[in-house]
Amino acid sequence: MDGEGVVTIGKQIRKNRPSPTYRAFAGASNTSMGVLKIFPKYYGGKIYHINERRTDKAGEKWADQYQWYCPISSTRRFLLDILPYLRLKTRQANLVLEFIQNKNAFARGKRKGRGGSSPLTQQEIESRERLRRQVRLLNKKGKYARSGGDG
Protein backbone atom coordinates (compact mmCIF):
# COMPACT_ATOMS: atom_id res chain seq x y z
CA MET A 1 0.00 0.00 0.00
CA ASP A 2 2.82 2.43 0.73
CA GLY A 3 4.09 2.46 -2.86
CA GLU A 4 1.15 1.35 -4.94
CA GLY A 5 -1.82 2.44 -2.86
CA VAL A 6 -3.91 5.47 -2.11
CA VAL A 7 -5.42 6.56 1.19
CA THR A 8 -7.29 9.85 1.01
CA ILE A 9 -10.50 11.79 1.60
CA GLY A 10 -12.45 12.82 -1.48
CA LYS A 11 -14.69 15.85 -1.82
CA GLN A 12 -17.51 16.35 -4.30
CA ILE A 13 -19.55 19.49 -4.82
CA ARG A 14 -22.85 19.13 -6.66
CA LYS A 15 -25.06 21.97 -7.78
CA ASN A 16 -28.21 20.29 -6.48
CA ARG A 17 -26.79 19.60 -2.99
CA PRO A 18 -26.75 22.11 -0.14
CA SER A 19 -23.32 21.01 1.13
CA PRO A 20 -20.29 19.12 -0.20
CA THR A 21 -19.99 15.34 0.02
CA TYR A 22 -16.88 13.86 1.63
CA ARG A 23 -15.84 10.22 1.54
CA ALA A 24 -12.98 8.08 2.73
CA PHE A 25 -11.12 6.45 -0.12
CA ALA A 26 -8.57 3.61 -0.25
CA GLY A 27 -7.30 1.54 -3.12
CA ALA A 28 -4.29 -0.02 -4.76
CA SER A 29 -2.89 -0.33 -8.26
CA ASN A 30 -0.28 -2.54 -9.87
CA THR A 31 0.78 -3.81 -13.27
CA SER A 32 0.19 -7.36 -11.99
CA MET A 33 -3.43 -8.28 -11.35
CA GLY A 34 -2.36 -11.23 -9.19
CA VAL A 35 -0.99 -8.90 -6.52
CA LEU A 36 -4.41 -7.29 -6.09
CA LYS A 37 -6.60 -10.43 -6.11
CA ILE A 38 -6.57 -10.81 -2.32
CA PHE A 39 -8.26 -7.43 -1.74
CA PRO A 40 -11.69 -8.16 -3.30
CA LYS A 41 -11.68 -11.57 -1.61
CA TYR A 42 -11.54 -10.03 1.88
CA TYR A 43 -12.91 -6.51 1.41
CA GLY A 44 -15.14 -6.62 -1.67
CA GLY A 45 -14.95 -4.36 -4.67
CA LYS A 46 -13.61 -5.16 -8.12
CA ILE A 47 -10.31 -4.99 -9.95
CA TYR A 48 -10.39 -2.75 -13.00
CA HIS A 49 -8.11 -3.12 -16.02
CA ILE A 50 -6.66 0.18 -17.27
CA ASN A 51 -5.40 0.03 -20.84
CA GLU A 52 -2.30 2.23 -20.78
CA ARG A 53 -1.76 4.35 -23.90
CA ARG A 54 1.29 6.32 -22.78
CA THR A 55 4.81 5.62 -23.94
CA ASP A 56 8.18 6.41 -22.43
CA LYS A 57 10.84 8.61 -24.06
CA ALA A 58 12.13 5.65 -26.07
CA GLY A 59 8.64 5.02 -27.49
CA GLU A 60 7.99 1.89 -25.42
CA LYS A 61 4.38 1.43 -24.31
CA TRP A 62 3.81 1.58 -20.57
CA ALA A 63 2.47 -1.60 -18.97
CA ASP A 64 -1.28 -1.85 -18.48
CA GLN A 65 -2.46 -1.22 -14.96
CA TYR A 66 -4.93 -2.90 -12.62
CA GLN A 67 -6.76 -0.91 -9.95
CA TRP A 68 -8.76 -1.99 -6.93
CA TYR A 69 -10.97 0.41 -4.99
CA CYS A 70 -12.08 -0.49 -1.47
CA PRO A 71 -15.85 -0.21 -1.01
CA ILE A 72 -16.93 2.50 1.43
CA SER A 73 -18.46 -0.13 3.71
CA SER A 74 -15.07 -1.89 4.10
CA THR A 75 -12.68 1.08 4.19
CA ARG A 76 -12.45 1.30 7.99
CA ARG A 77 -11.79 -2.44 8.41
CA PHE A 78 -9.27 -2.41 5.56
CA LEU A 79 -7.31 0.51 7.04
CA LEU A 80 -7.31 -1.05 10.51
CA ASP A 81 -6.03 -4.33 9.03
CA ILE A 82 -3.16 -2.74 7.08
CA LEU A 83 -2.21 -0.05 9.62
CA PRO A 84 0.44 -2.17 11.42
CA TYR A 85 2.23 -2.76 8.10
CA LEU A 86 2.25 0.80 6.78
CA ARG A 87 5.52 2.74 6.80
CA LEU A 88 4.81 5.85 4.71
CA LYS A 89 1.05 6.24 4.91
CA THR A 90 0.48 5.72 8.63
CA ARG A 91 -0.50 9.34 9.26
CA GLN A 92 -2.85 9.37 6.26
CA ALA A 93 -4.53 6.16 7.44
CA ASN A 94 -4.98 7.53 10.96
CA LEU A 95 -6.49 10.77 9.64
CA VAL A 96 -8.88 8.86 7.37
CA LEU A 97 -9.87 6.63 10.30
CA GLU A 98 -10.54 9.76 12.37
CA PHE A 99 -12.63 11.10 9.48
CA ILE A 100 -14.67 7.87 9.32
CA GLN A 101 -15.23 7.90 13.09
CA ASN A 102 -16.37 11.53 13.04
CA LYS A 103 -18.59 10.96 10.02
CA ASN A 104 -20.27 7.95 11.63
CA ALA A 105 -20.84 9.90 14.86
CA PHE A 106 -22.48 12.82 13.06
CA ALA A 107 -26.27 12.57 13.28
CA ARG A 108 -27.61 13.52 9.88
CA GLY A 109 -31.32 13.61 9.14
CA LYS A 110 -33.24 13.56 5.89
CA ARG A 111 -34.06 16.69 3.89
CA LYS A 112 -37.71 17.64 3.84
CA GLY A 113 -39.56 17.29 0.56
CA ARG A 114 -36.61 16.80 -1.80
CA GLY A 115 -35.07 13.59 -0.51
CA GLY A 116 -31.43 13.09 0.34
CA SER A 117 -29.64 14.09 3.52
CA SER A 118 -29.86 17.29 5.50
CA PRO A 119 -27.04 19.77 4.85
CA LEU A 120 -23.86 19.47 6.88
CA THR A 121 -23.37 22.07 9.58
CA GLN A 122 -20.61 24.62 9.02
CA GLN A 123 -18.70 23.05 11.93
CA GLU A 124 -18.93 19.60 10.32
CA ILE A 125 -17.81 20.94 6.92
CA GLU A 126 -14.82 22.64 8.57
CA SER A 127 -13.89 19.45 10.45
CA ARG A 128 -14.07 17.28 7.32
CA GLU A 129 -12.24 19.86 5.23
CA ARG A 130 -9.44 20.14 7.82
CA LEU A 131 -8.87 16.37 7.74
CA ARG A 132 -9.06 16.28 3.94
CA ARG A 133 -6.44 19.03 3.61
CA GLN A 134 -4.11 17.33 6.09
CA VAL A 135 -4.28 14.08 4.10
CA ARG A 136 -3.74 15.95 0.82
CA LEU A 137 -0.64 17.64 2.20
CA LEU A 138 0.78 14.31 3.33
CA ASN A 139 0.02 12.77 -0.09
CA LYS A 140 1.65 15.62 -2.04
CA LYS A 141 4.47 14.69 -4.39
CA GLY A 142 7.59 16.65 -5.25
CA LYS A 143 10.27 18.60 -3.41
CA TYR A 144 7.78 20.80 -1.53
CA ALA A 145 5.92 17.82 -0.12
CA ARG A 146 8.79 16.45 1.96
CA SER A 147 7.94 18.56 4.99
CA GLY A 148 4.35 17.30 5.04
CA GLY A 149 4.91 13.57 4.57
CA ASP A 150 6.48 10.79 6.56
CA GLY A 151 9.01 9.76 3.97
Language-model features: locations:
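Internal intein/HINT superfamily modules and their associated LAGLIDADG
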Residues: 1-151
